[in-house]
From Swiss-Prot:
Membrane topology designation: Single-pass type III membrane protein
Cytoplasmic side: 31-245
Top-level class of the enzyme under EC nomenclature: oxidoreductase
Native species: Gallus gallus
Active site: 123
Position of the signal peptide: none
Transmembrane segments: 10-30
Disulfide feature: none
Annotated function: Plays a crucial role in the metabolism of thyroid hormones (TH) and has specific roles in TH activation and inactivation by deiodination. Catalyzes the deiodiantion of L-thyroxine (T4) to 3,5,3'-triiodothyronine (T3) and 3,3',5'-triiodothyronine (rT3) to 3,3'-diiodothyronine (3,3'-T2) via outer-ring deiodination (ORD). Catalyzes the deiodiantion of T4 to rT3, T3 to 3,3'-T2, 3,5-diiodothyronine (3,5-T2) to 3-monoiodothyronine (3-T1) and 3,3'-T2 to 3-T1 via inner-ring deiodination (IRD). Catalyzes the deiodiantion of 3',5'-diiodothyronine (3',5'-T2) to 3'-monoiodothyronine (3'-T1) via ORD.
Catalytic activity of the protein: 3,3',5-triiodo-L-thyronine + iodide + A + H(+) = L-thyroxine + AH2; 3,3',5'-triiodo-L-thyronine + iodide + A + H(+) = L-thyroxine + AH2; 3,3'-diiodo-L-thyronine + iodide + A + H(+) = 3,3',5'-triiodo-L-thyronine + AH2; 3,3'-diiodo-L-thyronine + iodide + A + H(+) = 3,3',5-triiodo-L-thyronine + AH2
Protein name per Swiss-Prot or TrEMBL: Type I iodothyronine deiodinase
Amino acid sequence: LSIRVLLHKLLILLQVTLSVVVGKTMMILFPDTTKRYILKLGEKSRMNQNPKFSYENWGPTFFSFQYLLFVLKVKWRRLEDEAHEGRPAPNTPVVALNGEMQHLFSFMRDNRPLILNFGSCTUPSFMLKFDEFNKLVKDFSSIADFLIIYIEEAHAVDGWAFRNNVVIKNHRSLEDRKTAAQFLQQKNPLCPVVLDTMENLSSSKYAALPERLYILQAGNVIYKGGVGPWNYHPQEIRAVLEKLK
């Protein structure tokens, strides 16, 4: 690693640690104010509307040590981002559920847009909006192709865990990731599902953790969605595809 990257990582570590210390202190001294702040964040990801979770299932986990580790991983991973609108898309390797190694560009057909949906079953926002994504596949399959890339877990039971969530551990092997992806089959995805490599190459190059949406066309990134859960919006994909009809 270069000195510049190491310094950047150190700065991120200090920023995240400071925010966790301040957040934890606020939770102790001003619990009601902090709860309102966290609920306000939850509105952006529709977490407050998720019938599966009450605030007590997820809110108190903020500013924990596992929270710190996950946020740190996400922010460090973003330093590897190589996917930018109007620029060539990273042709990263992915693994089919039958074990075959493929690359993202192999799912492109002619000049048709390819929508990439990165996520995992322990990410409540990804699962809550999955039917909305499936509707996109149904409505636009005549003009576009779709691909789900199953990445590392957002809220693994042995990581930053939420109560009342699906119980999946962090993936130690590709077989673990494949087993986790089987849970997604219960949602009847209308497009192919592939696995990120255990080196998390797609997740890294697309800065996709914990969830993210992209549109590729002719080898370039034409739409880069915001980082989930707060800025993961399938309806933005609909707006772009409507213009391409």
